[in-house]
């Protein structure tokens, strides 16, 4: 056996080992996910209705449920903002004037889709949103 053979093997395998043992992308890497990219990532992490262990539901019903869940908080804020108190009845007290920046920040903190779009979400963040 030629003694140079193991040396050549190390020279050829060295770069492959560096790439294999180098820093791997972590699942905690935050990625900004907006719109349909957020929904696709959520379905990829949580699984879709076809893969769920629950009773099989039609795909359309699963999509509708996901969309309702994503927009639920936004709709609640819209209903409160658009409601008019009944005359003479107890109604919502007007909120003190706050800057647009604070309202925007508060809305982003309570809406997971908006948060992932603005700040980015890791795979672990998406897992916490699974039903």
UniProtKB/Swiss-Prot annotation:
Signal peptide: 1-24
Cystine pairs: 34-117, 46-130, 116-121
Region of interest (Disordered), ranges: 86-105
Propeptide: 58-104
Cellular compartment(s): Secreted
Function in brief: Seems to play a role in testicular function. May be a trophic hormone with a role in testicular descent in fetal life. Is a ligand for LGR8 receptor.
Family: Belongs to the insulin family.
Protein name in UniProt: Insulin-like 3
Lineage of the species this protein comes from: Eukaryota, Metazoa, Chordata, Craniata, Vertebrata
Designated gene of the protein: INSL3
């Amino acid at each position: 056996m030629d003694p140079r053979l193991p040396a050549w093997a190390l020279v050829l395998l060295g770069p492959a080992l560096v790439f294999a043992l180098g820093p791997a992308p972590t699942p905690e890497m935050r990625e900004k996910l907006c719109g349909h990219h957020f929904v696709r990532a959520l379905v990829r992490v949580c699984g879709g209705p076809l893969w769920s262990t629950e009773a099989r539901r039609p795909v359309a019903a699963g999509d509708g449920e996901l969309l309702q869940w994503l927009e639920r908080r936004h709709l609640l804020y819209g209903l409160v903002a658009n409601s008019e108190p009944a005359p003479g009845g107890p109604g919502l007290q007007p909120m003190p004037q706050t800057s647009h920046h604070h309202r925007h920040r508060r809305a982003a903190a309570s809406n997971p889709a908006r948060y992932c779009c603005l700040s980015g979400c890791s795979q672990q963040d998406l897992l916490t949103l699974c039903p």
